[in-house]
């Protein structure tokens, strides 16, 4: 039973655990993760273990494969537990020690003579693995030390310095070992103070020879055993050492004659090699070449084993291991590169496939492990040193694997020079196998430079440099093992030169063609002849770069997409298990199980650049391989070719995992058809089949647990096949990032980064650029537009001021203004924008309240966006204009678009409707997409009642679906940003009421017929450019035009203008032919009425229409003589002109009375009267039936009459010279009051009194629904469709 005090201590800073024995080959106490967190333990922290005996102190590790049964269980090696007096199942109390002292010196003693002999024979192994087995020691402790997999010895801790109850072994701790011989006596052991052995730190070179025979102690070094075993004459003879020497001498004579010299010469090096090769390391393992140098290698001194010649470093996948202190094992092995699927495919194309390979075609690398039956080695194997970091972790990986084994056992880092020499690219796969044969000792070496040497370099300089290099690269405890030919770099004349080191003769002749390795050391070099050649050897130049460097920008160099980039990078990091938290929590959903990333955005929005920047960050930060598939380039190819390209990319990514696959512009090969008519086209069928194939590839990678992340780009999520974006089944894309059009702040960032990337300078340092002003003027621009804009600005600057270097180029705001002139952004290309007429608010008469509402709702927010952006409530963006026809609704929409400076898109209602299911809704979506792309934009729907009637009244259901789509677009979740919706109708009662609720078209503005004051304003506006006579009284005209709308007043002025034209051109027709009312030539009979009930209303076209007619009248006065025949055609047709020789019939055929452009349509001839001629000649064009050729008498008569008309016309209009001179309209051509009254007599209002009453009642009921007559008296017929909206 635990006492009360101990229970209290357990609750405050300790824990009670149950001891369980294991077969682990170390002295660490293994604790479950929950207990580690409970005790707040730190790395290398000591733990006090207390039970019924004296407390002991142990070091701890976390049990990675711990079997937690719900209680605190601490595992420890059986031999350690028994020596401490523990029993399996016994309960002990654990308490973390707050402070641990590092030991400077530790004195130990083997427990028996057998232990001493075993320790003496396995000194090298113990030096390399001692710290892997024990870290915390305390006096009088007896601990086991393992020298191999099955053998262990016991040592006792004698004393610690400084004298502390417990301490920690460090890499620089000196370890004094007292030898224990079989005939040892008490007086034969020296004191601890006289010992010379020490335990040196990692990376330190040996500085002196050992004197272990003199002191009877072992001199241990963490990097190797002593460099030689030289004897001292002062060493006393000992029977045990004599027996040792006799035994070694007998073994020498027992060997063959060829092995005697090898035993006496280089025996220590061969012995060390065999000891190192006896280490328990993974055999024939596959590793992935990593890019980043691990911190454990980067932080070590340059003299350590990590930086020796031909040394590779193996690490486990867990990157957390890089943060702990390095404990490594060094062995010798062979490294060979394995061909990837793409490289194997390239070799297959270059050579003819053998019959064996035809039977076994290339397989996908998604298998459990790599075997020699389906992999191909690239190049010859290279002999090198292998530094195993985290060996226990690597062993656990092979031992505790899941049902599906990983492709690679771990990572291997190869120095750049060695990697390039072996032609191994980044993220390649290599196989490391142990060196099975014993290395031989060379007799002769040859050194030859691979580059030109300075002239003053001699052979002695090369030999000196080689000797220095060999002393740094090899010691007796860690000899250098090389292949038959190596490339080394020697320091010659204060510079590094590359040499080729080759073995000319070896001590033993090769038997067969087996693998050959040679051992070198500074001691062996004394008896090896070195041949030096100063002439450089001829080598093949290989200028190709084996590493493919991604030429992409990083996320911090883009601008405007920082939040999107961070979010997308978080998804990729979790998918590739790039963080400790990801490895702990998301190991079951790694790779594509976490879903793919979809980046969407419009054309030129930068989605491909963002995706490539994410790939660049993943390559740099996560050491991921990147495979890019340009789907746009695959469009139009055969299905088999596209599928093969995708399979190669996926296989390559699986081979080099962790990897990132980028499918750029995926909608080009796996997208939906643009129009419903193409749903069953061959392209659509192929796109659907490719989507199925892509889905199958992803499922296969998910099933084998590949560490692959997938990124795809598309214009929108709806553009892809439903199989890839369906909400049912497996979600392919679980992270969707949409790039919105940039706001002003984002445009500043984009512009700043584009200039910085192109010019290499920071734009903030230039005070000549006003970024805020340029960003405000580039509304609607996307990333690609800014790239083109900067190019145009640079071109503008260079054309103005040439520079010689890029640093001298300094852009200014004026350069950007010149670049913006005439530049159309990509978002506005292929967008049907309707340019409003050049009219302002001053060109509108009346409608003051309506104008003010439009200004407050649309114009002011467009001019002051920052002010309105701070409003807490969402501002109004939809307005419905309703009123009788001709009251100026269309005119208001155009004027507000021009005054606000926004883009203008006008939609006629019926043009959105289609007979195909879904086409009408798609047309509505496309319209709003166009408006979003062109924002700030005004979207104007004319004849709105035709596309948005009440639901339930359409037998086909087309308009019902259109209304539903409009409701979604007007008041969706995202809302409209920068798009204002205007709708015009004369029948608001027919519109679905759901569209008129707040948040949609929430403001209904009534455009009433003009009263007398408004009519006077309209007449003043319309007649501003007309030549009015002094007797014109517009006030009187406004009073006598009751019920006239703006369109009617426009028609009135048209007719008055034509009356003035008749009096100007044909004044005799009003007097010679009788009264004007009886004359058929009177142009007053051509009245212009506005009977349309649609949107060509009001002065929207009136002002410009009058201006155009005035221009035609002005031109009639200044026409040249050739154009005067248009008047003759008014009466005689074009055939007479041909007869007079004024043009061929082909040239004048377009001017015949039947042609649309004929002037006779505007001024029709009067067939019944002939006031200007004494005779009535009837002539027809040659194309008309009944044509007769004119006689000479008829021609003479016509010429005489034409001359009379010409003389009368010239006398009225003045000299011919004045006709060719442009000038203002003459005062003789003026619209008088009589012309207005004559036109009024033939002009009637477009809306009758009865229709006006109906409209008034209709609008009254619409504005006040509660005042409707008999609101509940409606009788429904059986089968009638109604709506509850």
From Swiss-Prot:
UniProt keywords, alphabetically: ATP-binding, Cytoplasm, Hydrolase, Membrane, Nucleotide-binding, Peroxisome, Peroxisome biogenesis, Phosphoprotein, Protein transport, Repeat, Transport
Pfam families per record: AAA, AAA_lid_3, PEX-1N, PEX-2N
InterPro entries: AAA+_ATPase, AAA_ATPase_domain, AAA_lid_3, Asp_de-COase-like_dom_sf, ATPase_AAA_core, ATPase_AAA_CS, CDC48_domain_2-like_sf, P-loop_NTPase
Record region (Disordered): 344-373, 1142-1162, 1262-1285
Top-level taxon: Eukaryota
Catalytic function, reaction form: ATP + H2O = ADP + phosphate + H(+)
Subcellular location: Cytoplasm, Cytosol; Peroxisome membrane
SUPFAM superfamilies noted in UniProt: ADC-like, Cdc48 domain 2-like, P-loop containing nucleoside triphosphate hydrolases
Phosphoserine PTM sites in chain numbering: 354, 1183, 1211, 1213
A Gene Ontology term for the protein's cellular component: cytosol
Feature: compositional bias, Basic and acidic residues: 355-373
Entry binding sites for ATP: 601-608, 883-890
SMART domains: AAA
Biological processes, Gene Ontology terms: protein import into peroxisome matrix, receptor recycling; protein unfolding
Class of this enzyme: hydrolase
Major location category of this protein: cytoplasm
Ranges annotated as biased composition (Polar residues): 344-353, 1142-1161
MF GO annotations: ATP binding; ATP hydrolysis activity; protein transporter activity; ubiquitin-modified protein reader activity
Enzyme Commission no: 3.6.4.-
Gene3D superfamilies in the cross-refs: 1.10.8.60, 2.40.40.20, 3.10.330.10, P-loop containing nucleotide triphosphate hydrolases
Known partners and oligomeric status: Homooligomer; homooligomerizes in the cytosol, interaction with PEX6 promotes dissociation of the homooligomer. Interacts with PEX6; forming the PEX1-PEX6 AAA ATPase complex, which is composed of a heterohexamer formed by a trimer of PEX1-PEX6 dimers. Interacts indirectly with PEX26, via its interaction with PEX6.
Protein family (similarity comment): Belongs to the AAA ATPase family.
Free-text function comment from the UniProt entry: Component of the PEX1-PEX6 AAA ATPase complex, a protein dislocase complex that mediates the ATP-dependent extraction of the PEX5 receptor from peroxisomal membranes, an essential step for PEX5 recycling. Specifically recognizes PEX5 monoubiquitinated at 'Cys-11', and pulls it out of the peroxisome lumen through the PEX2-PEX10-PEX12 retrotranslocation channel. Extraction by the PEX1-PEX6 AAA ATPase complex is accompanied by unfolding of the TPR repeats and release of bound cargo from PEX5.
Protein name: Peroxisomal ATPase PEX1
Source organism of the structure: Cricetulus griseus (Chinese hamster)
Organism classification: Eukaryota, Metazoa, Chordata, Craniata, Vertebrata
Gene: PEX1
């Amino acid at each position: 039973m635990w006492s009360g005090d101990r229970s209290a201590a357990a609750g405050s800073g300790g824990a009670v655990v149950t001891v369980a024995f294991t077969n682990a080959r170390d002295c660490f106490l293994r604790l479950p993760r929950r207990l580690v967190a409970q005790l707040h333990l730190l790395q290398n922290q000591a733990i006090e273990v207390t039970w019924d005996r004296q407390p002991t102190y142990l070091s701890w590790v976390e049990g990675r494969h711990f079997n937690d049964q719900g209680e605190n269980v601490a595992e420890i090696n059986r031999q350690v537990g028994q020596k401490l007096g523990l029993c399996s199942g016994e309960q002990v109390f654990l308490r973390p020690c707050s402070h641990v002292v590092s030991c400077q010196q530790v004195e130990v003693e083997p427990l028996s003579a057998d232990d001493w002999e075993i320790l003496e024979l396995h000194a090298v192994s113990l030096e390399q693995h001692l710290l892997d087995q024990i870290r915390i020691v305390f006096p009088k402790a007896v601990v086991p030390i393992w020298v191999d997999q099955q053998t262990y010895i016991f040592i006792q801790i004698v004393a610690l310095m400084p004298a502390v109850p417990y301490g920690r072994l460090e890499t620089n701790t000196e370890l004094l070992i007292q030898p224990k011989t079989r005939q040892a006596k008490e007086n034969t052991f020296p004191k601890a103070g006289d010992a010379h052995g020490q335990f040196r730190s990692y990376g330190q070179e040996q500085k002196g020879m050992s004197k272990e025979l003199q002191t009877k102690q072992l001199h241990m070094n963490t990097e190797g055993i002593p460099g030689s075993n030289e004897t001292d004459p002062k060493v006393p003879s000992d029977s045990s050492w004599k027996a040792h020497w006799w035994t070694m001498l007998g073994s020498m004579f027992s060997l063959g004659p060829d092995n005697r010299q090898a035993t006496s010469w280089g025996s220590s090096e061969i012995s060390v090699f065999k000891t190192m090769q006896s280490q328990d390391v993974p055999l024939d393992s596959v590793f992935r070449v990593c890019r980043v140098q691990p911190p454990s290698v980067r932080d070590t001194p340059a003299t350590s084993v990590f930086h020796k010649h031909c040394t590779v470093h193996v690490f486990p996948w867990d990157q957390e291991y890089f943060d702990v202190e390095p404990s490594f094992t060094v062995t010798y092995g062979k490294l060979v590169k394995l061909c990837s699927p793409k490289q194997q495919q390239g070799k297959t194309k270059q050579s003819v496939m053998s019959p064996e390979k035809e039977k076994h075609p290339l397989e996908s690398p998604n298998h459990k492990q790599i075997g020699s039956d389906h992999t191909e080695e690239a190049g010859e194997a290279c002999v090198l040193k292998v530094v195993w970091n985290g060996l226990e972790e690597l062993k656990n990986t092979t031992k505790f694997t899941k049902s599906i084994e990983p492709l690679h056992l771990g990572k291997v880092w190869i120095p750049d020079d060695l990697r390039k020499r072996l032609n191994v690219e980044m993220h390649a796969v290599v196989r490391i196998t142990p060196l099975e044969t014993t290395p031989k000792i060379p007799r002769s070496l040859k050194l030859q430079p691979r580059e030109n040497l300075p002239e003053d370099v001699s052979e002695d300089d090369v030999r000196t440099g080689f000797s220095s290099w060999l002393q740094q690269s090899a010691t007796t405890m860690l000899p250098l093992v090389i292949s038959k030919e190596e490339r080394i770099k020697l320091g010659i004349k204060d510079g590094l030169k590359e040499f080729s080191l080759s073995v000319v003769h070896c001590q033993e002749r090769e038997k067969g063609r087996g693998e050959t390795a040679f051992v070198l050391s500074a001691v062996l070099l004394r008896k090896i002849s070195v041949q030096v050649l100063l002439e450089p050897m001829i080598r093949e130049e290989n200028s190709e770069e084996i590493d493919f460097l991604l030429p992409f920008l990083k996320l911090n160099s883009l601008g405007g997409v920082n939040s999107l980039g961070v979010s997308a990078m978080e998804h990729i990091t979790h998918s590739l298990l790039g963080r400790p938290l990801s490895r702990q929590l998301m190991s079951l959903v790694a790779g594509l199980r976490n879903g793919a990333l979809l980046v969407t955005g419009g054309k030129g929005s930068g989605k491909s650049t963002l995706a490539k920047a994410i790939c660049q960050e993943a390559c740099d930060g996560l050491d991921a391989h990147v495979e890019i598939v340009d789907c746009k380039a695959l469009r139009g190819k055969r299905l088999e070719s596209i599928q093969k390209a995708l399979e190669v990319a996926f296989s390559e990514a699986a081979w080099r995992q962790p990897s990132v696959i980028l499918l750029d512009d995926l909608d080009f090969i796996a997208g939906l058809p643009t129009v419903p008519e193409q749903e069953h086209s061959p392209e659509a069928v192929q796109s659907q089949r490719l989507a199925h194939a892509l889905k199958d590839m992803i499922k296969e990678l998910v099933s084998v647990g590949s560490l692959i992340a997938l990124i795809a780009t598309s214009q929108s999520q709806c553009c892809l096949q439903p199989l890839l974006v369906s909400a049912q089944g497996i979600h392919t894309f679980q992270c969707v990032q949409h790039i919105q059009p940039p706001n002003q702040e984002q445009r500043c960032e984009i512009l700043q980064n584009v200039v910085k990337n192109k010019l290499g300078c920071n734009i903030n340092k230039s005070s000549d650029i006003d970024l805020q002003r340029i960003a405000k003027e580039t509304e609607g621009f996307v990333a690609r537009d800014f790239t083109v804009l900067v190019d145009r600005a640079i071109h503008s600057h260079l054309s103005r001021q040439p520079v010689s270097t890029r640093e001298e180029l300094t852009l200014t705001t004026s350069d950007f203004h010149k670049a913006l002139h005439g530049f159309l952004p990509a978002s506005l290309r292929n967008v049907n924008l309707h340019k409003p007429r050049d009219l302002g608010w001053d060109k509108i008469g009346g409608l003051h309240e309506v104008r003010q509402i439009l200004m407050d709702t649309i114009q002011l927010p467009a001019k002051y966006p920052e002010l309105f952006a701070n409003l807490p409530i969402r501002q109004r963006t939809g307005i419905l204009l309703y009123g009788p026809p001709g009251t100026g609704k269309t005119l208001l929409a155009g004027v507000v678009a021009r005054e606000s400076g926004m883009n203008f898109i006008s939609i006629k209602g019926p043009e959105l409707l289609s007979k195909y299911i879904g086409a009408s809704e798609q047309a509505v979506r496309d319209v709003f997409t166009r408006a979003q792309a062109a924002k700030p934009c005004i979207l104007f729907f004319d004849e709105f009642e035709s596309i948005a009637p009440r639901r339930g009244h359409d037998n086909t259901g087309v308009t019902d679906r259109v209304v539903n789509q409009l409701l979604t677009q007007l008041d969706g979740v995202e809302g409209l940003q920068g798009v204002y919706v205007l709708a015009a109708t004369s029948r608001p009662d027919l519109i679905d009421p759901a569209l008129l609720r707040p948040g949609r078209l929430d403001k209904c503005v009534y455009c009433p017929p003009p009263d007398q004051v408004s009519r006077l304003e309209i007449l003043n506006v319309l007649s501003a450019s007309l030549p009015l006579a002094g007797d014109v009284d517009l006030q009187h005209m406004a009073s006598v035009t009751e019920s006239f709308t703006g369109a009617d007043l426009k028609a009135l002025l048209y007719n008055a203008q034509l009356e003035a034209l008749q009096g100007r051109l044909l004044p005799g027709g009003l007097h010679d032919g009788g009264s004007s009312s009886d004359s058929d030539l009177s142009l007053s009979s051509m009245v212009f009425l506005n009977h349309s009930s649609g949107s060509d209303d009001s002065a929207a076209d009136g002002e410009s229409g009058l201006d155009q007619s005035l221009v035609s009248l002005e031109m009639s006065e200044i026409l040249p003589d050739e154009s005067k025949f248009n008047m003759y055609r008014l009466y005689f047709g074009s055939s007479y002109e041909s007869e007079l020789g004024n043009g061929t019939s082909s040239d004048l055929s377009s001017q015949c009375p039947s042609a649309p452009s004929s002037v006779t349509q505007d001024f029709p001839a009067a067939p019944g009267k002939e006031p200007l001629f004494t005779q009535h000649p009837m002539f027809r064009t040659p194309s008309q039936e009944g044509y007769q050729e004119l006689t000479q008498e008829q021609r003479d008569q016509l010429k005489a009459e034409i001359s009379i008309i010409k003389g009368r016309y010239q006398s009225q209009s003045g000299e011919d010279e004045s006709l060719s001179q442009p000038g203002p309209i003459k005062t003789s051509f003026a619209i008088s009051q009589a012309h207005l009254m004559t036109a009024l007599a033939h002009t009637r209002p477009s809306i009758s009194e009865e229709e006006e009453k109906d409209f008034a009642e209709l609008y009254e009921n619409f504005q006040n629904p509660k005042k409707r007559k008999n609101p509940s008296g409606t009788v429904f017929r059986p089968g009638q469709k109604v709506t509850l909206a």
